[in-house]
């Protein structure tokens, strides 16, 4: 999978998205991370967090828990790093 993701693809990621990916890679595989915990780990404000998560989800580097529940100003409730996200972070991060 990671062979389809190149250094240029990683370099094009927003710095906030890279920060979110790095923070998520510290958690065990299969663990959902609530957005408020991710905020504490990254220090990103809601707009930056929402943008980073949308970008990473489009790139298939993380999965968003589909739920109507939201935490405050965040558009999401919880996320999980994908296997591709782990591989990309390990290779390029």
Protein language model regions, located:
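Short acidic, hydrophobic short linear motifs in intrinsically disordered regions
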Residues: 29-41
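Short, amphipathic alpha-helical interaction segments positioned at domain boundaries
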Residues: 77-93
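Short, solvent-exposed loop/turn segments that connect beta-strands within catalytic domains
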Residues: 70-75
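A short, conserved structural fragment
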Residues: 57-69
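Short amphipathic alpha-helical interaction segments
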Residues: 43-59, 76
């Amino acid at each position: 999978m990671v062979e389809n993701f190149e250094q240029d693809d990683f370099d094009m990621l927003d710095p906030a998205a890279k920060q979110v990916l790095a923070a998520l890679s510290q958690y065990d595989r299969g663990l959902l991370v609530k957005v408020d915990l991710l905020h504490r780990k990254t220090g990103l404000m809601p707009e930056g967090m929402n943008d980073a998560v949308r970008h990473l989800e489009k790139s298939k580097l993380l999965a968003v828990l589909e739920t109507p529940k939201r935490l405050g100003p965040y558009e999401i409730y919880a996320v999980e790093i994908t296997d591709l996200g782990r591989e990309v972070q390990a290779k390029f991060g």
